[in-house]
Amino acid sequence: MAIASESPTTVTSAGLQTYGQTNVKYDWWAGNARFVNLSGLFIAAHVAQAALSVFWAGAFTLYEISQYKPDLPMGEQGLILLPHLATLGFGIGEGGKVVDLYPYFVIGAVHLISSAVLGAGALFHTFRAPHDLSTATGRARRFHFRWDDPKQLGIILGHHLLFLGFGALLLVLKATIWGGLYDANLQTVRLITQPTLDPFVIYGYQTHFASINSLEDLVGGHIYIAILLIAGGIWHILVPPLTWARKLLMFNAEAILSYSLGGIALAGFVAAYFCAVNTLAYPVEFYGPPLEVKLGIAPYFADTIELPLGQHTSRAWLANAHFFLAFFFLQGHLWHALRAMGFNFKQLETFLNPAIEN
């Protein structure tokens, strides 16, 4: 089966909901559904998607550098990547002033180079590696999976959690060792030498996480998140899903996709609110002032300062983008969850338009 084809692809699938049909045809726009049972091509697709994401990050960073105006506040220029790099302490001097754009250029270039490496990996997995890892030899065979195999899905979940944990740990190392973070309270970049390790303080933010105003607490929270993610990753790699989990969860491609989309939707809603109101992780100097919620055709976050017509702060762009993307991810979660449970949307179409039956 080709990774991309102009003609429909036929898949005999136990992973996706087929409503009893043995052969289901997917056109090119169906994406990963075309090779849902080909574990090798599934990896190729994900590596290619990672390459595109990293390429966008690198290219857009360089684009924002070309558009940056030092005489205007960064938060009022509609930038979305440079503010993140500034918050991490790159190229920032006293008072939150950008004193050096070169670190941003390096980061953009590194992302472009990384995207090329990932793209090469995607091409390798597409054209040279086995399309079905069950036929592979050596360690590669270990990453073959079936959608109805909870043990193997748990191993893959474990590896995902490890990468997320290492990502959280990298932020901790950046804050405590590699140059520090920008402190919006002091308007300077500093090392976080005494992160909060009291679990009661960290857990206390469960009810008001968006009000956090201490970098020590922020970094301490990431330490706990890193520990939990890495420990969870090791657990899922070594321990198959327990009996209660096997009974509670559904193990098929449609259900796994719905779980993933639901998790992304939750993260998106949380990020939207956090970005809209928090000025520690999203300093006013780089993102503009906090937003207010307004209601139009749909809820949205609005700027609280006067800007020229059609212009918005970085905070407004990010908060609204996260909110609306999370909303559509939530719809995808519900769609695939219902399909996983056997709901046939074509029956709904027939119910609403009886003429279809004829």
Swiss-Prot record:
Membrane topology: Multi-pass membrane protein
Keyword Cell membrane: no
Induction statement: By iron stress.
GO biological process, alphabetically ordered: photosynthetic electron transport chain
Gene Ontology molecular functions: chlorophyll binding
Recorded superkingdom: Bacteria
Cofactor names: chlorophyll a; all-trans-beta-carotene
One Pfam family, short name: PSII
Transmembrane segments: 40-60, 79-99, 104-124, 219-239, 255-275, 318-338
Compartments where located: Cellular thylakoid membrane
Keyword Transmembrane: yes
Entry note: cofactor: Chlorophyll a.
One GO cellular component term noted in the UniProt record for this chain: plasma membrane-derived thylakoid membrane
Keywords: Chlorophyll, Chromophore, Membrane, Photosynthesis, Photosystem I, Stress response, Thylakoid, Transmembrane, Transmembrane helix
NCBIfam families: PS_antenn_a_b (TIGR03041)
Role, per record: Functions as an antenna for photosystem I (PSI) under iron-limiting conditions, when phycobilisomes disappear. In the (PSI)3(Isi3)18 complex most of the harvested energy is probably used by PSI; in other PSI-containing supercomplexes a large part of the energy will probably not be used for light harvesting, but rather is dissipated to protect the organism from light damage.
Subunit field text: Under iron-starvation forms a complex with PSI trimers, where the trimer is surrounded by a ring composed of 18 IsiA subunits.
Family to which the UniProt record says this protein belongs: Belongs to the PsbB/PsbC family. IsiA/Pcb subfamily.
Annotated protein name in UniProt: Iron stress-induced chlorophyll-binding protein
Organism: Thermosynechococcus vestitus (strain NIES-2133 / IAM M-273 / BP-1)
